[in-house]
């Protein structure tokens, strides 16, 4: 049973830092709860740190949130060269360009290598016909242009990719158990005939001696589907999950399953 294989780790306080393996230290830099002078918002960002390198997963909503929270936690983000974005939504991509602008002055490669899943740059439309794109941009192509002008290179993934030692981006997640987990009313065409199922939703898996620890931005691909994708990379148990699961409207019965 999947319910026996995944232990949900609930983060109730911003800046909860966990040593979940000897290799990486994880620090949550943005979520909807704040404490001790930090900024809280509807968003997500987390930092992986090892002796070898630092990797950022998602960049928060407002451009200054991750910058501020990292500063008060004494986290040196100038060491971050690689970023994994879970999906295009602005509450996960809003800080990227500002982070690059600030830290490239200290490290020319800072925030320059960004991994996204196929479909990230698809143009989206609200049900009223207005456009929606990444990073607080309405037009996806404008976001891409602005980021690339700052020296950011996007690596588009169709399948999983090893980002660092024992750290993997899932790339595209096959929708096996659940086809879509997320908001409705968004489309991929101006005529509003093709519903957006956020095919670019991906997660990060960290391989430890005990198995996989999964980090999800929103879980639009479905948490079980994502766990299955990690096990297709290496058949180890998924014993921990961190981040957003988009289960806030789910019944208790659904959440427990």
Model segments located where?
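Active-site metal-binding motif and surrounding structural segment of the metallo-beta-lactamase
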Residues: 64-116, 231-242
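Charged helix-capping and loop-helix junction motifs
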Residues: 253-257
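Conserved beta-strand hairpin/beta-sheet module of binuclear metal-dependent hydrolase folds
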Residues: 24-73, 197-215
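Bacterial N-terminal signal peptides that target proteins for export
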Residues: 1-10
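Active-site environment of divalent metal-dependent phosphoester hydrolases
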Residues: 36, 63-65, 90-93, 121-124, ...
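Active-site-proximal loop/helix segment associated with metal-binding centers of metalloenzymes
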Residues: 132-138, 162-209
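N-terminal signal peptide c-region/cleavage motif recognized by signal peptidases
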Residues: 17-18
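Acidic/polar short surface loop at catalytic or gating sites that assists cofactor/ion binding
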Residues: 112, 116-151, 171, 175-186
């Amino acid at each position: 049973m999947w319910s026996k294989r995944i232990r949900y780790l609930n983060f109730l306080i911003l800046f909860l830092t966990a040593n979940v393996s000897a290799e990486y230290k994880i620090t949550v830099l943005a979520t909807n709860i704040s404490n001790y002078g930090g900024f809280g918002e509807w968003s997500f960002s987390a930092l992986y740190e090892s002796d070898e390198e630092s990797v950022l997963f998602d960049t928060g909503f407002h451009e200054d949130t991750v910058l501020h929270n990292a500063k008060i936690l004494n986290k040196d983000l100038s060491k971050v060269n690689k970023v994994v974005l879970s999906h295009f939504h602005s509450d996960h991509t809003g800080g990227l360009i500002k982070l690059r602008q600030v830290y490239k002055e200290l490290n020319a490669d800072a925030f320059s290598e960004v991994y996204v899943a196929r479909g990230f740059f698809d143009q989206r439309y609200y049900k009223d016909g207005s456009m929606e794109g990444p990073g607080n941009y309405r037009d996806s192509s404008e976001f891409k242009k602005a980021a690339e002008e700052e020296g950011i290179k996007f690596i588009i993934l169709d399948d999983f990719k090893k980002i660092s030692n024992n750290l993997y981006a899932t790339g595209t997640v096959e929708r096996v158990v659940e086809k879509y987990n997320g908001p409705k009313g968004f489309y991929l065409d101006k005529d509003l005939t093709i519903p957006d199922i956020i095919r670019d939703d991906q997660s990060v898996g960290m391989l430890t001696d005990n198995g996989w620890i999964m980090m999800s931005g929103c879980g639009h691909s479905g948490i079980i589907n994502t766990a299955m994708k990690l096990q297709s990379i290496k058949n180890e148990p998924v014993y921990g999950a961190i981040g957003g699961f988009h289960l806030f409207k789910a019944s208790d019965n659904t959440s427990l399953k």
